[in-house]
Amino acid sequence: MRQLRILIFFISFLGLATLNAQQKTDTIKTKESYGLRIGVDFSKPLISFLEEGTKGLELVGDVRVLNNYYAAVELGYEDKISKEDYMNYTTKGSYIKAGVNYNAYKNWVGMTNEIYVGMRYGFSIFNQTLNSYTPNVKGTYFIPTEVLPNTEFKDLSAHWGELVFGMKAETLKNLYLGFSFSFKKMISTKEPENFKNLYVPGFNQVYLNDTGFGMNYTLSYLIPIVKKEK
């Protein structure tokens, strides 16, 4: 429900910006800004504050290369303690995702808002530490006992692809609020023996068929470099 409210909030901003733009006079030739937009996923620090055992930061950036096409990149790190039915483990590592966005939103004169679809290639290097596990033993003769191995698996890696849907709305001059949702599919992963990578930095939780999902909420600033005629 909280995520739905945030999504409605972003859509409202986009609609308000469109309404204001309708009052402007159109001209035959207009110039649009091309530049570097950098920002942060502000949900990461918020989750780190609210959820014990979770730390993370993600920086985002994109560059407008053609009228409706943007080269995009996200990079970050995560340090997360996960608790499953029979185990407790820590995942710590960094990641980078790079790709392209296509803006399908037709802006009014002077607007640079986006409703986009995109693709990403993701890569992560990380360590896993098995903090504890409880053998799955059922019956009246054996009582499950928690084992504390503290075994660390180093130099693990993962490669994956993403399909991304999102939006960005200019709320103040060159300042943008954004939201995106991504469907992820694992391509390959280096795993320790007898221990599956159930969580990967940048990919998040690994579900059945090596799929995953992600969302981010961003605040970014556009640094104009050049202006080109539309």
Predicted regions and their residues:
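Short glycine/proline- and aromatic-enriched beta-strand/turn motifs that initiate or cap beta-hairpins
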Residues: A21-R64, E74, S220-K230
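Transmembrane beta-strands of outer-membrane beta-barrel pores
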Residues: F42-L46, L75-I81, Y102-A104, Y121-N127, ...
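Glycine- and aromatic-enriched membrane insertion/assembly motifs of diderm outer-membrane
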Residues: F49-V109
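Extracellular/periplasm-exposed beta-strand and loop segments of Gram-negative cell-envelope proteins
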Residues: S48, G76, K80-G93, F126-V137, ...
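Residues that define the transmembrane beta-barrel architecture of outer-membrane proteins
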Residues: Y34, G53-L57, K92-I96, N113, ...
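Membrane-embedded beta-strand positions of outer-membrane beta-barrel proteins
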Residues: I38-V40, G61, V73, A98-V100, ...
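Outer-membrane beta-barrel "beta-signal"
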Residues: K97, N101, N209-K230
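Short loop/turn motifs that connect adjacent beta-strands in outer-membrane beta-barrel proteins
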Residues: Q23-Y34, N68, K106-E114, T171-L177, ...
